[in-house]
Amino acid sequence: MKVTKSDIVISAVKPEQYPSGGLPEIALAGRSNVGKSSFINSLINRKNLARTSSKPGKTQTLNFYIINDMLHFVDVPGYGFAKVSKTEREAWGRMIETYITMREELKAVVQIVDLRHKPSVDDVNMYEFLKYYGVPVIVIATKADKIPKGKWEKHAKVVKQTLDIAPSDELVLFSSETKKGKDEAWNAILAKINK
């Protein structure tokens, strides 16, 4: 999909701050520093609409971006960052749970994992949490450019097995450097919002 317009709408914490208008939403979740902002920027052809950070755990709000006036990307705070206090982690959990369970506009969650590594316990917990609530998931395995092409299948198998990816959910290998998987990611997203 060609993105001609993309802007941040609001950084929200509470449901009353979520945008109105009924546009379909795709939430993006992933461990801190997994490359979520790079994934968003790569999909929308912008250098830094979603701010990339060398400081993990920087996003502490739900950041709503409007894309081509037809859908919202919702950047969810990164999970699994050890230096965040227990209180902050609990607040994060409540905010995510409220959004995922109450938001009718939510069509799917893009869960971002690092193709180079076996998904972490936090990744597995997040995937299971989404499945528990019946949320469709698109798993994006980033940093494919850091692995020789001949090993992609082996790494993809580890991701599939560790997360126990449901047959209805997709796995897309992606690289924000080479743009590998960009079209597949968009196709998967558009299929979910057009259901």
From Swiss-Prot:
One Gene Ontology cellular component annotation held by this UniProt entry: cytosol
Residues at which Mg(2+) binds: 37, 59
SUPFAM superfamilies, per the entry: P-loop containing nucleoside triphosphate hydrolases
InterPro entries: G_ENGB_dom (IPR030393), GTP-bd (IPR006073), GTP-bd_ribosome_bio_YsxC (IPR019987), P-loop_NTPase (IPR027417)
Essential cofactor(s): Mg(2+)
UniProt domain EngB-type G: residue ranges: 22-195
Residues where GTP binds: 30-37, 57-61, 75-78, 142-145, 174-176
Biological processes, Gene Ontology terms: division septum assembly
GO molecular function: GTP binding; metal ion binding
Keywords: Cell cycle, Cell division, GTP-binding, Magnesium, Metal-binding, Nucleotide-binding, Septation
Pfam families in UniProt: MMR_HSR1
Annotated S-S bridges: none
Physiological role: Necessary for normal cell division and for the maintenance of normal septation.
Protein family membership: Belongs to the TRAFAC class TrmE-Era-EngA-EngB-Septin-like GTPase superfamily. EngB GTPase family.
HAMAP family, A to Z: GTPase_EngB (MF_00321)
Identification of the protein by name: Probable GTP-binding protein EngB
Organism: Bacillus pumilus (strain SAFR-032)
Lineage: Bacteria, Bacillati, Bacillota, Bacilli, Bacillales
